[in-house]
């Protein structure tokens, strides 16, 4: 088997995210990734095997709903499902194997998944023929939890839940987009949690699914995001590629309990044509149809056309100014361009105070003491001189945001680690400690 993998960043038909289109990395664009960079494998599967399942957990009705898809069907085949708490079977079902027919499994006194208690049930799927022979067996897991919006709050398991996120771009010094080991994926989550974050906005990269596994196991909230930068939004081919790839991403990752938000786009500002507004709307509607169980943040910090909640980016370094900027009378800070996209097209929406509001990029502080000046090294605003200056600035910014906790239901700090010349991480690029 020979695989030829090619990705031409210059075509703009494939979204490269933050891979630099220049020879070298610059500003917030980094070293390009070549070849197959995520885990791939070959597996022998029975022709009537289980291709995938979509799992919906309903904590209000105390049940799990499993919708199976098979490679193909054969008369007499059945699907057996067992849900286990340790070695104890808490629910089981044996049904005729049928494409896309939901299987409802009641769970008595369910144990819920949350960051504080990331409980996972083991699940065993078995496809059997008419004689009872097992054709295919899949071991999996499920976390019972609910994420929903009510008014201006985002709820986890029917309780308002404040999200303290960090921006994670998933770059590594040696493998670029490829983590050096499974332990490294787990370690990124553990060091984020050690710094006080309860989750991450996974930024401009489709993360290895193993990362989601560790997030599920450790109780770490994540936002899934497409590598949307660099596409040509006026290209039909680019739009088709985006929709095709985004569909695959949502279908692959939608069963992970740790994943609580979809973010297909980052900072879209192309507000000059109605086509962009329609594209954003189409992707939003597609995402909601593929996965109605999670909110969609259509564009992080950019053009606000249609979304389940509003997000903004602000790198104002002065905490007092940030406080005044965020909430002035009845108007929240919104960096989007005012007015309409243009006459005769979509109205440009403003935050109306009726949906959740999150500052999903702020901070980005470089510290001169922690990162001595190097050519092209940067952070947002003027660098903090000492680590103590960094602590004070960080504290003032966080206080500015959380002081509006009745209006703002979460934040995302930029960023978890330094990435090449962007040296504003909580940790160094090699994952060693930078601060107390």
Task: List PLM regions with ranges.
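Secreted/periplasmic carbohydrate-active enzymes, especially glycoside hydrolases
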Residues: 1-204, 208-209, 214, 218-219, ...
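Catalytic metal-binding/acid-base residues of hydrolase active sites
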Residues: 6, 227, 265-269, 292, ...
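Substrate-binding clefts and catalytic carboxylate motifs of secreted carbohydrate-active enzymes
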Residues: 28, 32-35, 42, 48, ...
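Hydrophobic residues in well-ordered beta-strands that form the structural core
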Residues: 222-224, 298, 359
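Active-site groove signature of glycoside hydrolases
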Residues: 246-275
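An active-site-proximal structural segment forming one wall of the substrate-binding cleft
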Residues: 239-256, 286-290
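Polar, glycine-rich mid-to-C-terminal structural blocks
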Residues: 279, 310-312
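Active-site cleft segment of glycoside hydrolase catalytic domains centered on the general acid/base Glu
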Residues: 232-239, 265-286
């Amino acid at each position: 088997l020979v695989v030829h993998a090619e990705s031409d960043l210059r075509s703009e038909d494939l979204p490269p995210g933050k891979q630099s289109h220049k020879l070298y990395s610059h500003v917030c664009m980094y070293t390009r990734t070549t070849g197959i960079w995520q885990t791939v494998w070959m597996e022998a599967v029975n022709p009537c095997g289980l291709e995938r399942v979509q799992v919906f957990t309903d904590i209000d009705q105390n049940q799990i709903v499993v919708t199976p898809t098979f490679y193909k069907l054969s008369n007499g085949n059945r699907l057996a499902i067992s849900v286990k708490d340790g070695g104890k079977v808490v629910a089981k079902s044996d049904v005729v194997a049928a494409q896309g027919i939901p299987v409802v499994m009641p769970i008595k006194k369910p144990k819920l998944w949350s960051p504080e208690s990331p409980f996972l049930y083991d699940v065993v799927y078995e496809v059997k023929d008419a004689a009872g022979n097992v054709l295919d067996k899949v071991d999996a897991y499920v976390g019972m939890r609910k994420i929903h919006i009510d008014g201006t709050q985002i709820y986890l398991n029917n309780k308002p839940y404040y999200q303290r996120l960090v921006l994670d771009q998933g770059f590594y010094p040696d493998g670029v987009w490829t983590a050096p080991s499974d332990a490294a994926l787990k370690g990124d989550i553990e060091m984020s949690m050690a710094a006080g974050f309860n989750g991450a906005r996974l930024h401009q990269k489709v993360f290895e699914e193993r990362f989601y596994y560790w997030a599920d196991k450790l109780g770490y909230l994540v936002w899934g995001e497409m590598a949307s930068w660099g596409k040509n939004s006026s290209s039909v081919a680019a739009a088709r590629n985006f929709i095709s790839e985004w569909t695959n991403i949502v279908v692959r990752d939608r069963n992970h309990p740790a994943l609580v938000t979809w973010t297909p786009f980052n900072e879209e500002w192309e507000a000059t044509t109605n086509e962009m507004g329609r594209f954003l709307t189409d992707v939003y509607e597609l995402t909601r149809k593929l996965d109605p169980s999670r909110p969609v943040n259509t564009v992080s910090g950019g053009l606000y056309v249609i979304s389940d909640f509003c997000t903004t980016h602000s790198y104002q370094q002065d905490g007092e100014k940030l406080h005044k900027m965020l909430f002035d009378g009845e108007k929240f800070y919104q960096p989007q361009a005012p007015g309409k996209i243009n006459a005769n097209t979509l109205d440009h929406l403003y935050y109306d105070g009726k949906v959740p509001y999150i500052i999903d990029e702020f901070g980005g502080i470089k510290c001169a003491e922690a990162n001595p000046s190097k050519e092209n090294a940067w952070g947002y605003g003027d660098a903090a001189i000492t680590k103590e200056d960094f602590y004070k600035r960080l504290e003032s910014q966080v206080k500015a945001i959380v002081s509006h906790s009745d209006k703002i239901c979460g934040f995302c700090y930029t960023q978890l680690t330094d990435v090449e010349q962007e040296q504003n991480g909580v940790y160094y690029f090699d994952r060693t400690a930078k601060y107390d």
